[in-house]
Regions:
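Feature of Fe-S/electron-transfer and energy-metabolism proteins
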Residues: 1-211
Length: 211
């Protein structure tokens, strides 16, 4: 952190690369067990694909594509996994809305609009562990037989969008994304959609209408 920055030094500060800024994190609580944020704030962790794979990344995707889709939905139900919005809606229940034999195209949308002022729960993941988000989406796509997915990100978050775009290209280069992923005979693409900054688009139906 930079302290006592005077107006005349502002131009110097703007020249410092963002990667050189380090925000200190408090030590974890003795009873804390991080899951989603287990890689957030680590000095030895970077956002590139190689680092993610070294830390166990995409292992769960490999496991998922070896399982029957219905078994994945049942496992998610049993886990009690919930959405990270205010409602905390059970993920497995939402997945169950899709019929196993659905003939119409099904699309997956990740709501990364995060329009609540002062909320950073999504941006932490996007900026510091983007491949975790992508892997979760790919597992969801496999479980629901979805071939096209979107990440709807707020227009005011251009850096986050760029990070996700780079991560998607890395994943595609390693065959985690695109045609016949991991030799499973399954095609899936993820697209970034930048919103226009409307607050209402953080709500599910408003987001879908905007998209």
């Amino acid at each position: 952190l930079l302290a006592e920055v005077k107006p005349e030094r502002a131009s110097e500060v703007l020249k410092i690369p963002p990667a050189e800024f380090h925000l200190p994190h408090p030590p974890p609580h003795p009873l804390e067990r991080r899951l989603i944020f287990q890689n957030i704030g680590r000095d030895d962790y970077t956002i590139d694909l190689d680092c993610y794979v070294r830390n166990g990344g995409y292992q769960q995707l490999n496991k998922a594509i070896s399982m029957a889709r219905a078994d994945i939905v049942d496992e998610v139900k049993t886990s009690g996994l919930r959405g990270r919005g205010g409602a905390g809606f059970p993920c497995g229940v939402k997945w169950s809305f899709i019929k196993p034999d659905e003939k119409k195209p099904v699309y997956l949308i990740c709501n990364a609009d995060e329009s609540e002022p002062g909320t950073f729960k999504d941006r932490y993941i996007i900026h510091q562990d983007p491949h975790q988000l992508i892997e979760g989406m790919l597992i969801s796509c496999w479980a629901l037989n979805v071939h096209t997915a979107y990440i709807y990100i707020r227009g005011e978050f251009p850096e986050g969008a760029k990070i996700l775009e780079r991560a998607i290209e890395e994943a595609r280069a390693r065959n985690y994304l695109g045609k016949n992923i991991l030799g499973a005979g399954f095609d899936v693409e993820i697209y970034i959609h930048r919103g226009a900054g409307a607050y209402i688009c953080g709500e599910e139906t408003g987001l879908i209408e905007s998209l």
